Structures are given as structure tokens and as C-alpha cells.
Amino acid sequence: MTKNLPRPDVIITHESDLDGLVSGILLQRLAKALFNTDVRLEAYHYHGWRQRDLRESAGWVADLAFEPRMDRPNWAVIDHHATETLPKNATLIHNLEKSAGLLCYELCQLHGLTSPALDRLVHLNNISDIFLEDDPDFVIACDYANLVKTYGFWNLHALVNGQLEKLLDHALLEVMAVKRRIEDPIGLAWSRENVTEISPTVGFVDTVIGNNNLIVHQLLEQNITRFPVLITLFRRTSGMTIASLRSRNGEALKVAEKLQGGGHANASGATLPRSVKTNQDAINYLRQVLNPRREISEFNSLESVFDALEKERG
């Protein structure tokens, strides 16, 4: 399978989660083994990725959905998101039922790039990213995933100096465990009383503490709200606001795409405009984008009022 991989000028991965971190670092190791070269790693959120030109003549992309602009000679995509694009020029390694990290690790295994520590880490990443909630390791797997959500992609990358194995049993996992035991129940109790309607099918969940993804998962699992899609916000130090969308029956991705985002059917994300500074800004923006018919209806009603006034004046 790796015989079809071109020599990359760049490796690009998803910045938002552990799967992107695992995928990117594993592909760097694979490139070193195949071509004896150190290939630079870049990571993007969905909005930044869509704005990036593919200026290199060759590259590898992981954990970002395959789309027509990526169908280029000497490009390879290793991913697990749904896509309607079939490759004609690029190499596509794709499986909806495996995380991107697992797909990359399977390529590494073909060249002996394995270890018990990596076996364990890739396994936990796969559980958290695919959200295999019935797996006995699900809780600890979510603690690992929360490391990237809490500390950020590049901070963790620097902390372990690109050596994934150092994440296994890292001391910071004790922090994640404490946060899960103490913060999550408090956060869930507060958030369940603070859900705002965005549209008839989308609710905004305000959060103050705890793991947003697990809180929303419980809200959906327990049918606490009437909305099939729930949105939470995460603000990065750069000022960007990331919207995280969750559902149980595949509705989240369709909503994310309306926001120029992407992801999985039940777990997606989107970057909101930089003009969004507060939760109320976000609510106003989301309502505007996700309720176009309501806006048209209101506009038509207003137009009718003006028409009536004109007739009275006439």
C-alpha cells in the first residue's frame, strides 16, 4: 500500500483533536522511514484549511475530508470522514469505521514502526475519535482526547517533542481525571438549564465548566433537550471561536456544512467569523445562518407592512 505514496513536501493534519495529532506525527515518522527526510507538519482547523492553497507539488493529508481540490497527482489523503468525491489522481486511503490515526498506524506497521506504547495510544485514540462508548476503555480514552482540547495541539506537540509515546500515562491525565470526576457533573447540571434555541432543530448549550463533548453527549443520550443538534463554543487564544456540533442520528454534519465546517455525521465543527466575540454574537450569527427562511418570512412580512402603508398614503 505504501508503494503508492508519493514523497511529500508537506504533511497536513487536523488541529482540533487528538486524532489529528496522532495522525500527523505518525505520518512524519513514515515519511522518514520511506524517504529518509524530515517533512514539516502543518495543522489546521476546518476554516483555515479551506483557505489554504495547495501550492506544493506533493503532500500528505490526514484527518481532513477528501474533496475535489485535493484530487491531485502526488498527493495522498488518509482519512475517515464521509466524502462524495472519488479520487482520479490522488491516492486515497479511506475507512469510515477507523480513525485517521489508526489508518496511519496501519501504514507504519508495514514498515515496522510499532511499539506496545503506540499500540495502546492508537487504540485509545481510535476509541475516543470514533466515540466507541461501549468500549471498556472509553472513559480513559476521552481523558486522552481531552488533553488536546484543554492544552492545544501545538502545546502538546512541543511538550512531548513530537514523541507520541510520552503521552501514554502522562501526569496531565491525572488532571483530566480530576476534571472529569468533579467538573463534568457540575457542568452538566448547569448546562442542562442553559440551552438556547437557535432553530427548531438546533440548540446552543452554554458551558462554564467540564468536558463540553461529554456534557453534550449526556444531554443527547438522556433526551434532556428537544433539539437533535446541540452546539457548544470553544474560544482559542488566537481569538477564533470554534463551534462544536453533536447529534445522535447524523444531523450534525449537515448543519456544520452550512457554517462552512465539516467532520463526522454526529460530531462536527466549524470556525465562526472573527467578528464573533461573545456568546450572544455567536447566537445571533448562528440564527442568521441557520434560519434563512425565517429571515425571508420576516422580510416579506415587513415588506407587506410597507406596502400597506403606501396604499393608505395613496
PLM features: what roles do these ranges have?
Residues 126-195:
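Hydrophobic, aromatic-enriched interface-forming segments
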